[in-house]
Design a protein with these regions (language model features):
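Signature aromatic-anchored transmembrane alpha helix within multi-pass, membrane-resident enzymes
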Residues: 8, 198, 223-227, 231, ...
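Transmembrane-helix motifs of polytopic, lipid-linked glycan transferases
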Residues: 89-93, 97, 101-122, 159, ...
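Hydrophobic/aromatic-rich transmembrane helices and adjacent perimembrane loops
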Residues: 143-144, 150-153, 186, 191, ...
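Membrane-interface transmembrane helices that cradle and orient dolichyl/undecaprenyl
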Residues: 1, 119-121, 125, 160-176, ...
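Catalytic lumenal/periplasmic loop and adjoining terminal transmembrane helix
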Residues: 19, 23, 27, 239-241, ...
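Transmembrane-lumen/periplasm boundary regions of multi-pass, lipid-linked membrane glycan transferases
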Residues: 17-20, 41, 63-64, 185, ...
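Short helix- or helix-capping micro-motifs
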Residues: 11-17, 130-135, 162, 183, ...
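Start-transfer (signal-anchor) and selected internal transmembrane alpha helices
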Residues: 1-20, 109-112, 119-121, 128-129, ...
Length: 540
């Protein structure tokens, strides 16, 4: 099959995987980060100020979504007001679906750019294998279904990677400029992408060492790249300067939180081991092994070119591994380089087979190598896509409560499990009374004691909804108060409804901040936590 046609089929397949179950959970958004970080700020921008007033994550995706919402819903200038804010509060389905489709399309664009990167660093065969791997890899597919910046970051990062190679090969002024601008755009999508400047430095100094660049040319080109980077950062994040005190406060606060305090119930593994483990399922076992081999082969064959691919994944791994909090998606910016390295190793392995066959047989070996690299990702992506197609346990729980618990009843709902306003149905007079849980919600499990149950009963909060997301975190952390609370609750109540995400007969999945939210383990039949609704004994 010609390369262009093959790439077209790969892109189509990658898009299908990313659009499958794209409306999962809606009209409710169960991923807390997706619910809070980008889409609500973009909606506010449509008819208001372009200042996001939020810098914990950079705003490039927010601005893009705001522009899409303007065009999609004919809202804000120059269309006039269309009440997008009110309709978003009533039913956010259309807005979140639009945002997710944008991310899915950008994720698919990333697949095409991975082909470009593989072809530019080596040849078209490496590019096609890399594209297949990225099209199917579980973590890029999964986060292309969320209105988050993780999959989006791969687009400017891959462009930056290729343009750094162009600087190493030719070092024309516009290549310096595009490399710097691409890094700047990547930083405005995800701050950790800034480490890509090291790859640009490797390209520049590699050319200098090979005496294909003078110091004057290096300084001139470097100045062009830095200027382009700064311009890109300012254009896509102008209020970082206008509202610098807020920008500085939020970024430093976020960095301090991620670097100094782990999440309650988090794995005790060192971060460096944790991120290697995430590659075994986020990308796949064979791709991980192939990437390690590819790193050695690439550096051996061409030191500078190989280091350009190896440097960013290693730097990001060292930095993230030293943080207190660990999430598999945080390491996704390293996936483009890792994918190219794995594909390079696969093609080298196919070429090493001593065959005197016609070239078509050799091509078949490359196809087989690519299929082997991609099969784990394809299998897990298809399986999780089918899981997401089922109704979430939280939606089932809400439906049961609406039909079986009288309006006005008092409910205790554990925090950070349901979206805002999830159980506030009907008019205020007929909605449920929710027990006021004081923030910070991340410390909820620390403050649990059996005495709370008497408080619930005295104040008429007769129903207590327990979610495995909170329950398991408290027990994993070893909090005695949480353990005693859940034991007392079980002894002083009856479970009136139970909604499980697991297949019949499957063992519950041990809580993990990745696997419990991406539903990768085979035990899952539907998305969501295990939920139990307790009715307190002797409560009126």
């Amino acid at each position: 099959m010609p390369g262009g046609a093959a790439l077209g089929w790969i892109l189509l397949g990658g898009l299908v995987l990313r659009l499958w179950s794209i409306k999962h959970g809606l009209p409710y958004v169960y991923n807390v980060d997706e619910e809070q970080h980008f889409v609500p700020h973009a909606v506010n921008m449509v008819g208001g100020s372009l200042n996001p007033h939020y810098f914990e994550n950079p705003p490039a995706l927010t601005y893009l979504l705001a522009a899409v919402f303007k065009l999609r819903f004919h809202a804000g200038f120059p269309f006039g007001s269309s009440g997008i804010e009110r309709s978003f509060l009533r039913d956010p389905t259309a807005v979140f679906t639009s945002a997710r489709v944008v991310v899915a399309l950008l994720g698919t664009l990333g697949v095409g750019l991975i082909y470009w990167a593989g072809a530019r660093f080596y040849d078209r065969r490496v590019g096609l294998v890399a594209a297949v791997l990225m099209a199917c890899a579980f973590l890029p597919v999964f986060y292309s279904k969320q209105a988050l910046n993780d999959a989006v970051t791969l687009v400017p990062l891959t462009v930056a990677l290729v343009m750094c190679l162009a600087v190493y090969e030719r070092a024309r002024w516009w290549e310096w400029a595009i490399a710097g601008a691409a890094i700047g755009v990547a930083v405005d999508v995800k701050y950790t992408a800034g480490a890509m400047v090291v790859v640009l430095a490797i390209a520049a100094f590699g050319r200098l060492i090979e005496k294909r660049l003078t110091w004057r040319q290096l300084l001139t080109g470097g100045a062009i790249s830095v200027a382009a980077l700064v311009v890109a950062v300012i254009v896509l994040n102008p209020y970082a300067l206008v509202d610098f005190s807020l920008f500085k406060h939020q970024v430093l606060n976020q960095a301090g939180t991620a670097g100094s305090s782990g999440k309650i119930g988090q794995s005790s593994q060192p971060g460096w081991i944790y991120y290697i483990w995430t590659l075994t399922w986020g990308l796949g076992w064979l791709p991980l092994i192939a990437a390690a081999a590819g790193a050695v082969l690439a550096v051996w064959a061409d030191r500078v070119r190989g280091l350009m691919l190896v440097a960013f994944p290693i730097l990001l791994w060292l930095f993230l591994g030293g943080q207190a909090r660990h999430f598999g998606r945080w390491y996704m910016p390293a996936y483009p380089a890792i994918t190219v390295l794995a594909s390079y190793a696969a093609v080298r392995a196919a070429d090493a087979v001593p065959l005197s066959w016609v070239p078509r047989r050799r091509t078949a070996l490359v196809v087989a190598a690519g299929a082997l690299l991609a099969v784990q990702g394809l299998w897990t992506s298809v399986r999780v896509d089918s899981v997401l197609a089922h109704t979430d346990t939280r939606t089932l729980t809400r439906q049961w409560i609406e039909h079986n618990v009288p309006p006005g009843s008092g409910l205790v709902v554990e925090p950070a499990v349901f979206p805002a306003r999830f159980l506030k149905v009907g008019s205020p007079k007929h909605s449920y009374r929710l027990y006021p849980i004081k923030p910070p919600f991340q410390a909820y499990e620390k403050h649990l004691t059996p005495a709370l149950i008497d408080t619930y009963r005295q104040q008429g909060y007769c129903y207590v909804l327990v979610a495995s997301y909170q329950h398991d975190r408290g027990l994993n952390a070893g909090f005695k108060g949480a353990r005693d609370y859940y034991r007392a609750l079980a002894a002083q109540s009856q479970v009136v409804a139970r909604f499980s995400p697991y297949r019949f007969g499957a063992r519950p999945v041990r809580f993990n901040f990745d696997l419990s939210y991406n539903f990768l383990p085979r035990a899952y039949m539907r998305p969501g936590p295990l939920l139990e609704l307790h009715k307190l004994n002797g409560c009126q």
